[in-house]
Amino acid sequence: MEVNILALIAIALFISVPTAFLIIIYVKTISENN
């Protein structure tokens, strides 16, 4: 079974970018509440 490196990178970015974005918003919200 051949693994497509570009596909793995695309999936990793597609998952990690929105997740990091949500984490940043979450941290900013906590900081503002304090």
Swiss-Prot record:
Write down the superkingdom of origin.
Eukaryota
Which Pfam families does the UniProt entry name for this protein? PsbM
Q: Keyword Protease on this protein?
A: no
Q: How does it sit in the membrane?
A: Single-pass membrane protein
- Record keywords: Chloroplast, Membrane, Photosynthesis, Photosystem II, Plastid, Reaction center, Thylakoid, Transmembrane, Transmembrane helix
Query: GO cellular component annotations, sorted alphabetically?
Result: chloroplast thylakoid membrane; photosystem II
- Residues annotated as transmembrane: 5-25
What PANTHER family does the record point to? PHOTOSYSTEM II REACTION CENTER PROTEIN M
Q: What is this protein called?
A: Photosystem II reaction center protein M
Q: Which gene encodes it?
A: psbM
